[in-house]
Amino acid sequence: MLRLEKLVKTYKTGDQALKEVDLEIPQGQVLALIGPSGAGKSTLIRCVNRLVEPSSGKVYLGNVELTGLSSSALRRERRRMGMIFQEYALVERLTVMENVLSGRLGYVGFWRSFMRRFPQADVDEAFRLLDRVGLAHMADKRADELSGGQRQRVGICRALIQDPALLLVDEPTASLDPKTSRQIMRLICELCRERGLAAIINIHDVALAQMFVQRVIGLRFGAMVYDGPPEGLTPDRLTEIYGEEDWEATIEQVDDDEIEAAE
């Protein structure tokens, strides 16, 4: 599904954000990226869809080498990669429905998108997705009227309406409270299972990674230092990943009754 070969990103300052990362993710696998600040987690995600250009190495989505594509070919392939952002990246003045449908901009012509005249099949799918995440009744609300958790659900719908093969998820819970964070992580993982999607989730909360994903990648100074199941994240292993940074501080505290409510 997704394959990274010797992926390197070196900035003009000489700082190396990624150091020859080799990674393969099969279809349907949800993977979490963990590591201290500056480890290269967000850079890795953005190198996959070339929002950040890799310095060297190759990225394959299926049989397509993304790193060798022209701009127009890359735009087509980006339709296969849904992106979910930390700060939601919604258009505040647009409605929930309009924000979701913006995920179809890569499929409809300029004038149809400019006039917001999307095919009925796209509108129907948007309603189905909003219903799945519990927001169908808010389709006509403006985005700036929503809570953080509701905004992230809209962002999830916008990514899924692209009908992607891969989800790239960058710190989806960083702006949310512990209870809502668990709800959002559970929702993302459930939707990936339902749709057979592969996903890379950059997550700051180690406990969320341990709770919800099948596989964890630990990055430190741009290099992979752990690749395995969440059960393998022992205190010693986490100290190896985070170094002097207190990894326990990344774990959001939540009361037992809040965990139960998030189920």
From Swiss-Prot:
It catalyses: phosphonate(out) + ATP + H2O = phosphonate(in) + ADP + phosphate + H(+). The keyword Transmembrane helix does not apply. It is a peripheral membrane protein. It comes from the Bacteria. CDD domains: ABC_PhnC_transporter. ATP binds at residues 35-42. NCBIfam families: ABC_phnC. This is Phosphonates import ATP-binding protein PhnC 1. The gene is phnC1.
